[in-house]
């Protein structure tokens, strides 16, 4: 990361175990404000655990995670809830409410967390994010009428409507066809450009990694093995990185 940039996420000496299984082993990582970081690695190497610790869904055993200037582990429940409004989490499966229309799904977290907003302001913000994800015409449809790629974009829009400063994406293109994957990759890039958010993107998709990431982090066995640009990481002589590239490259 370039020196002198303001830090959005600062992770130092992070350890996490589940029983006898040590998932993270001394992870260090910085994410600058306005930077997209892609975290790559085999299944089970601790990638998803890492971002769940960042947003306070899990607690580390050792180490520190400072998000937007606050040590996550030490926050009270009220302060943690306030921080989570600034940290958007896009899960692998977009858990939309089937009985609600698209606009109602997106408005739900806004109305729950910002009760002072008028109905007119809520509708305005919902339409704005739908326009950002290029799905304004679906506002009155139900989730069952949407494709997998559209559901993923609506899930992202539901997070964006809260105007977060950080986005966490967990396998954003998993299960999508190539065209939908390209649309999601473009959306992630555009969100950074339009909203200036920082992001950690967990993925196995090398096309996603190359098109969305300012910097790549390669993890093996709970440790950051290599970080740098896409070219720097995959020109590495490390045999495990070569093997990962050969296995995942399409």
Predicted regions and their residues:
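A short, proline-enriched helix->beta-strand linker immediately N-terminal to the Walker B motif
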Residues: 161-165
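Helix-to-loop junction immediately C-terminal to a conserved catalytic motif
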Residues: 55
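Helix N-cap at the start of a conserved alpha-helix in ABC-type nucleotide-binding domains
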Residues: 178-180
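Short coil-to-helix segment of the ABC ATPase nucleotide-binding domain corresponding to the Q-loop/switch region
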Residues: 100-108
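Conserved ABC ATPase "signature" region
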Residues: 71, 118-137
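Catalytic Walker B motif of ABC-type/P-loop ATPase nucleotide-binding domains
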Residues: 167-170
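Conserved ABC ATPase signature
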Residues: 142-146, 150
């Amino acid at each position: 990361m370039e020196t002198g940039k303001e830090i959005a996420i600062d992770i130092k000496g992070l350890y996490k175990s589940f029983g006898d299984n040590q998932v993270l082993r001394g992870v260090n990582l910085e994410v600058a404000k306005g930077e997209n970081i892609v975290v790559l690695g085999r299944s089970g190497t601790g990638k998803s655990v890492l971002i769940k610790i960042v947003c306070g869904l899990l607690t580390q055993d050792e180490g520190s995670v400072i998000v937007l200037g606050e040590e996550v582990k030490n926050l009270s429940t009220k302060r943690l809830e306030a921080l989570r409004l600034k940290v958007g989490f896009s899960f692998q499966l977009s858990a939309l409410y089937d009985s609600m229309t698209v606009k109602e799904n997106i408005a739900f977290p806004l109305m729950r967390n910002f009760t002072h907003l008028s109905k007119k302001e809520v509708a305005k913000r919902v339409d704005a994010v739908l326009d950002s994800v290029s799905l304004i015409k679906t506002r009155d449809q139900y989730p069952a009428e949407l494709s997998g790629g559209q559901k993923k974009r609506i899930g992202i829009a539901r997070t964006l409507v809260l105007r977060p400063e950080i986005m966490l994406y967990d396998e954003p293109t998993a299960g999508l066809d190539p065209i939908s994957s390209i649309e999601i990759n473009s959306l992630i890039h555009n969100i950074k450009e339009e909203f200036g958010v920082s992001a950690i993107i967990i993925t196995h998709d090398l096309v996603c990694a190359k098109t969305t990431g300012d910097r790549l982090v390669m993890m093996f066995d709970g440790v950051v093995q290599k970080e740098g640009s896409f070219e720097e990481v995959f020109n590495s002589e490390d045999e495990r990185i070569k093997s990962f590239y050969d296995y995942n490259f399409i």
